[in-house]
Amino acid sequence: EMSASLVGSEMCIRDRSVTAYGADAESAVSDAIAEIERLDALLSTGETDSEIYKLNQNGGGSISEDTSYLLERALEIWKSTDGCFEIGIYPLMQEWGFTDGNYKVPDKETLQKLLPLADSSKIDFNEKNQTVSFEQDGMEIDFGGIAKGYTSGRIMDIFREHGITSGMVSLGGNVQVLGCLLYTSPTPRD
């Protein structure tokens, strides 16, 4: 659903919302939605055509500039948090049912088997060649802890490119704003 007026444009799809105010608001929102869809298709763990899905299935491969940037940042955060931020957690997320909604508490034996897979030190990343490989069979990554922030940052860049001075993006509860909301009615209740 998309609505536009002289002052702004807004689009809501599933749990995502993009709002922009300014002369080029409609085009900015359209470009923002296209970027959200592009990054989602690239970074999704569940879409069989996504780069991350293919990396997880093949244990590595060549990656795009966006994925390379996110992997570099994720590994930096992993190091700076002494491993508390871990992108190699995907096998554990699957076992707990977070990926398909079939939640369960795994038994201790299964968890002990999967825990060694959640270890970013076993990710071999060649920044120059934009390639990655997992040193341990069964490793899989998930950018869920960093991708929405990256995506909303890209939306803010798009807004600025379109001269937008006020806007908002909400991606499944992660919200980023630019400028301030411009009220067009005398009171907020009108």
Predicted feature residues:
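Short, small-residue-biased leader/transition segments that mark boundaries at the very start
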Residues: 1-12, 186-190
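N-terminal cap/recognition module
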Residues: 9-45
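Internal glycine-rich flexible loops
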Residues: 23-26, 30, 42-182
